[in-house]
Amino acid sequence: MNLPKNGMTYADAGVDIDAGNALVDRIKPAAKRTNRSGVMAGLGGFGALFDLKDAGYTDPILVAATDGVGTKLRIAIDTGHVDGVGIDLVAMCVNDLVCQGAEPLFFLDYFATGALETDKAARIIEGIALGCERAGCALIGGETAEMPGMYPAGDFDLAGFSVGAMERGAALPAHVAQGDVLLGLASDGVHSNGYSLVRKLVEVSGLSWDAPCPWAEQSLGAELLTPTRLYVKQALAAIDAGGVHALAHITGGGLTENLPRVLPEGLGADIDLSTWSLPAVFGWMAQTGGMQEAEMLKTFNCGIGMILVVAQEEADKLTQLLASLGEDVARIGHVSAREGVRYSGTLL
């Protein structure tokens, strides 16, 4: 091998430092728009600083969450529609934080690829910033890892990390009791779980990502990339109003596995499936794959992205509050004295 005249450089190995610096410069304005009380510095330092007192806390408990977007990224990569996956990444983390009763404060991302494409990376991270802005948390740092030989051309991976806080004694779940009402908040589609099965179902259907969507006006790929709904501000408003005993983010495992995570030992849930309409995407998947209702309910959100467990006497007030904040709310069931989730009515 003949060496370059002036010796080898990092660029010769496939790592473009200049592209990385250009990316940071491009995303700084988007990150700056996420600034909130408590943020002490912008991007660029070795670590990010956050002042909990400046954010209004006196005796805070910190809550941390991390997540990814799963194989939904494969659809984004194959179609080139990458703008929304950053919102997915944020939502998967911050929606989990509010289930503990915490306000999301700040967010960090990890973006990894084999060869950095500045425009694509910027679109993704600008999506992350938009998600943070909508959730009220600051994008205070991240890592862009350009790793030649680790990923096929054009591929990338994402991970997100978020920290929130609540005052001591305010953690959820708390005071869940038999008879508590289950309020279901509508999802915006599949969100970010079950996409290995989604992709298999699309393969079985014989449709391509750019084919017209069978249940919507845009392409199939674009429809399946609808971002995960952010429930942060609505959930925090409900918590502040009083009467919320628990929240369950309906992700991998569906309603069947996620709701029991916030119920105390000895209690379960009775859910009436006729209390909301199954979104068309789930009906199409069930029909395409010949899926049974039980399998749907333990795999997908089936139209309910977040469940609030609330005191019976506060259910009407909270329903009205959430509806006023733009949520499609359904009273889907109640907490019962037997463990597990039992269903009545039909979904399919």
From Swiss-Prot:
Report if keyword ATP-binding is assigned: yes
Q: Which Pfam families match?
A: AIRS, AIRS_C
**What pathway does this protein act in?**
Purine metabolism; IMP biosynthesis via de novo pathway; 5-amino-1-(5-phospho-D-ribosyl)imidazole from N(2)-formyl-N(1)-(5-phospho-D-ribosyl)glycinamide: step 2/2
Entry EC no(s): 6.3.3.1
Q: Which residues form a coiled coil?
A: none
On whether Glycosyltransferase is a keyword of this UniProt record, the answer is no
Q: Which domain of life is it from?
A: Bacteria
GO CC terms of this entry: cytosol
Catalysed reactions listed for this entry? 2-formamido-N(1)-(5-O-phospho-beta-D-ribosyl)acetamidine + ATP = 5-amino-1-(5-phospho-beta-D-ribosyl)imidazole + ADP + phosphate + H(+)
Intracellular or extracellular location(s): Cytoplasm
For the biological process aspect of GO, one term held by this record is: adenine biosynthetic process
Alphabetized, the UniProt keywords read: ATP-binding, Cytoplasm, Ligase, Nucleotide-binding, Purine biosynthesis
Q: Which GO terms describe its molecular function?
A: ATP binding; phosphoribosylamine-glycine ligase activity; phosphoribosylformylglycinamidine cyclo-ligase activity
NCBIfam families the UniProt entry points to: purM (TIGR00878)
Name the protein family.
Answer: Belongs to the AIR synthase family.
- Its protein name is Phosphoribosylformylglycinamidine cyclo-ligase
